[in-house]
């Protein structure tokens, strides 16, 4: 049996980690031999195939850049919606001074985030943190949460989050395809010539991977 389903399972379970360490494609001596042999046997015709694969890898890198940019654009949009939400709700008459002060503080933090210079992972982590803190403040005002304006913003933010996850999945798909391609023969020979290496896939921050503790809600 290749796999035995009767094997005892670890009580701790298993959570896979993302390995984004750089790994350059290194063709074996045999692969290099056949690569050169193809050139000789095809009397240089293989060169045009080589150029085609080289251009393909260049296009792939541009697609990865574009996919990464789409993640940042989606996060930028969610940030803008959150700021607009706080600006619209900050005049809520029943807010206590402490709550109002915290909301103003969160808005300032959002405004100070440099979307263009912050990595997608860090950007998502910062905005998630602020949104979580904001939701905690709004929990104290059930009548506000039931208002049409609040529900409208919440729906829009949820839509933006769905778009973010979609752009992340798209990025990972393109990056994984590129990573698989540069390690297969004979593309690995081309990749080595171009000094290419694996592209990092999206990795959740340590805080985002922590299980949500709901024990306090039962007390």
UniProtKB/Swiss-Prot annotation:
<keyword id="KW-1003">Cell membrane</keyword>
<dbReference type="InterPro" id="IPR023353">
    <property type="entry name" value="LemA-like_dom_sf"/>
</dbReference>
<feature type="transmembrane region" description="Helical">
    <location>
        <begin position="32"/>
        <end position="52"/>
    </location>
</feature>
<protein>
    <recommendedName>
        <fullName>Protein LemA</fullName>
    </recommendedName>
</protein>
<dbReference type="Pfam" id="PF04011">
    <property type="entry name" value="LemA"/>
</dbReference>
<keyword id="KW-1133">Transmembrane helix</keyword>
<keyword id="KW-0812">Transmembrane</keyword>
<comment type="similarity">
    <text>Belongs to the LemA family.</text>
</comment>
<feature type="coiled-coil region">
    <location>
        <begin position="54"/>
        <end position="82"/>
    </location>
</feature>
<keyword id="KW-0175">Coiled coil</keyword>
<keyword id="KW-0472">Membrane</keyword>
<dbReference type="GO" id="GO:0005886">
    <property type="term" value="C:plasma membrane"/>
</dbReference>
<dbReference type="InterPro" id="IPR007156">
    <property type="entry name" value="MamQ_LemA"/>
</dbReference>
């Amino acid at each position: 049996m290749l796999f035995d389903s009767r094997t005892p399972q670890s009580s701790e379970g298993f959570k896979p980690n993302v390995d984004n360490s750089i790994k350059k494609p290194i063709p074996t001596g045999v692969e290099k031999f056949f690569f050169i042999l193809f050139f000789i046997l095809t009397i240089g015709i293989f060169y045009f195939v080589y150029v085609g694969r080289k251009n393909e890898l260049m296009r792939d890198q541009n697609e990865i850049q574009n996919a990464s940019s789409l993640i940042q654009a989606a996060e930028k949009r969610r940030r803008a919606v959150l700021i607009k939400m706080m600006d619209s709700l900050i005049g809520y008459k029943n807010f206590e001074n402490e709550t109002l002060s915290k909301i103003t503080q969160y808005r300032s933090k959002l405004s100070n985030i440099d979307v263009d210079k912050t990595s997608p992972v860090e950007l998502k982590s910062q905005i998630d943190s602020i949104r979580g803190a904001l939701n905690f403040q709004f929990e104290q005002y059930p009548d506000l949460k039931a208002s049409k304006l609040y529900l409208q913003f919440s729906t829009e933010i949820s839509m933006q989050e769905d778009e973010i996850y979609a752009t992340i999945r798209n990025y990972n798909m393109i990056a994984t395809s590129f990573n698989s391609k540069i390690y297969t023969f004979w593309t690995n020979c081309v990749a080595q010539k171009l000094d290419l290496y694996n592209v990092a896939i999206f990795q959740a921050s340590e805080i985002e991977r922590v299980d949500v503790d709901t024990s306090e809600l039962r007390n």
